[in-house]
Amino acid sequence: SYTEYPECLNVASDSAGNTLLIKQKDFISCYSPETGSFQDVHVRGMNEEVSKVLFAEGERQFFIFDADGCLLEICPDFDSFPLALDIRKTPIHEKKIDRAYYLDGILYYVDMENRFYSYRMKDRQKKYLADLTCWMNQYGNLSRIALFHSTPYLVFRNGLLLNIDNQEEALGFDVGLFCVLPDRKQDILWVGTDGQGVRMYYDKYNRFSGIQLKSLPIVMRNPVRSIY
């Protein structure tokens, strides 16, 4: 954790432990294990609202997908003093961006017209996936996206789990949903609910079971906001 940047959500680290985060307006904060501290680099116009997602693709290679639909490649030079950032901007979408996620080498994003796209970083291939308007009108905004069996599963805030490749079998809930996490060792997708514990989704059997909050060894009455 970074105590000097409380409640920071825009943070990414590469395999060497180099870390970039966005918390302060007009700055990108950079950490290197060699120095053991953060340096704040001025980047005009940068803030938490502009940066829809921040992620690392390789050592000392970071990307920001911004609200204007531009992909910013950021390569920090930790050997220079003061620290310098090489920033290259590439427009990849013509509409404003609502939200974005990065999963296993692929950038997923929803624009302000509720169109859902993927952008494969390896070969810079953009693909239209779906129009989410009808789902968002009924179930609210996206809470999270997860890959399960290499397929994007979309979690909607007001109670919907949607397999983007099989929308006819969308699973509705009578409770709000906050988060989702694929199990690394079992064929299970964990879904955190608003006050009804954690649900387990078995894709093989196309069914759910659950763990209620009262069954946990600790007293917990709040919604499940995240799963690790």
State where each predicted segment sits.
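Carboxylate-rich, polar loop motifs that coordinate divalent cations or form catalytic acidic clusters
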Residues: S1-Y228
